[in-house]
């Protein structure tokens, strides 16, 4: 979904940067508070950043002035929330723009709003709604990750349609065209990403459940049930 350098008009680049900045500020404040409380969170933050960087660098071509790929934001969103994810995602997008020519500096605001902010907010909402229910935590993780992924591309389609409305049908026609093209690759990718993140959480819960408990991601009872189910599968 990385919109390439120079593809958006300057006015829209400025708009998306202005929308992104408050989330970055809030995320930085939260990060500083977290680091003062416990610097042991740093390794997991690094893992979250690497997860986003690697998955979002796996590009599939798309004919929308962009590309399709997993976003990888689900892990950070569930563990740290969407504001911290905005900062982690912004750092990833900056490195990708400078080192991989993936996205751009002028369009970084738009890319942040879609991948580092909008998608994570949607994924976090799904996680919070399902967290305290009886639904299996791996299903919760799967859906939160998949929704964060697909909403990222809905927002990217929205951004592109605002910048380039169709001559016939205007914004809605343009939005439908952009997202229908993205959906061909992105719906399967979002499902795959959800499965991958569920497996990652299964690994963490089996080996280092105290990380999940310390961050209050899931309750001790939920983790115990998940570990018991995992042990039963092995047996």
UniProtKB/Swiss-Prot annotation:
User: Per its UniProt record, what PANTHER family does this chain match?
Assistant: COBALT TRANSPORT PROTEIN CBIM, PTHR43627
Function summary: Part of the energy-coupling factor (ECF) transporter complex CbiMNOQ involved in cobalt import.
Supply one GO BP term: cobalamin biosynthetic process
Q: Which family does it belong to?
A: Belongs to the CbiM family.
**Which residue spans traverse the membrane?**
9-29, 41-61, 80-100, 107-127, 135-155, 160-180, 181-201
According to the UniProt record, one GO cellular component term is: ATP-binding cassette (ABC) transporter complex
This protein's record includes keyword Membrane:
yes
Cite the HAMAP family for this sequence.
CbiM (MF_01462)
Stretch forming the signal peptide: none
Q: What is its main location?
A: membrane
> What keywords are annotated for this sequence in UniProt?
Cell membrane, Cobalamin biosynthesis, Cobalt, Cobalt transport, Ion transport, Membrane, Transmembrane, Transmembrane helix, Transport
Q: What Pfam families does the record point to? A: CbiM
In the UniProt record, does the keyword Transmembrane occur?
Answer: yes
- Bilayer topology annotation: Multi-pass membrane protein
The annotated pathway is: Cofactor biosynthesis; adenosylcobalamin biosynthesis
Could you tell me one molecular function GO term of this UniProt entry? cobalt ion transmembrane transporter activity
Outline the subunit composition: Forms an energy-coupling factor (ECF) transporter complex composed of an ATP-binding protein (A component, CbiO), a transmembrane protein (T component, CbiQ) and 2 possible substrate-capture proteins (S components, CbiM and CbiN) of unknown stoichimetry.
What highest taxon heads this organism's lineage?
Archaea
- Which locations, inside or outside the cell, does it occupy? Cell membrane
Any coiled-coil regions, as ranges: none
Q: What is this protein called?
A: Putative cobalt transport protein CbiM 2
Report the source organism.
Methanosphaerula palustris (strain ATCC BAA-1556 / DSM 19958 / E1-9c)
């Amino acid at each position: 979904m990385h919109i390439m350098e120079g593809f958006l008009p300057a006015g829209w680049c400025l708009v998306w940067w202005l929308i992104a900045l408050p989330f970055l500020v809030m995320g930085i404040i939260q990060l500083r508070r977290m680091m003062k409380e416990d610097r042991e969170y740093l390794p997991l933050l690094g893992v979250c950043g690497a997860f986003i960087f690697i998955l979002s660098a796996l590009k599939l071509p798309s004919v929308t002035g962009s590309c399709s790929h997993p976003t990888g934001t689900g892990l950070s969103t569930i563990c740290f929330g969407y504001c911290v994810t905005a900062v982690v995602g912004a750092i990833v997008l900056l490195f990708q723009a400078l080192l991989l020519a993936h996205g751009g500096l002028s369009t970084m605001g738009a890319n942040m709003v879609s991948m580092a902010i909008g998608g994570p907010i949607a994924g976090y909402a799904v996680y919070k709604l399902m967290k305290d229910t009886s639904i299996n935590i791996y299903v919760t993780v799967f859906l939160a990750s998949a929704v964060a992924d697909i909403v990222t591309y809905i927002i990217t389609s929205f951004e592109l349609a605002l910048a380039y409305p169709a001559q016939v049908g205007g914004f809605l026609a343009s939005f439908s065209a952009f997202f229908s093209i993205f959906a061909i690759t992105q719906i399967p990718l979002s499902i795959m990403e959800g499965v991958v993140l569920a497996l990652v959480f299964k690994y963490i819960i089996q080996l280092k459940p105290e990380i999940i408990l310390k961050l209050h991601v899931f309750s001790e009872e939920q983790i115990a049930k998940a570990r018991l189910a995992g042990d039963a599968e092995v047996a």
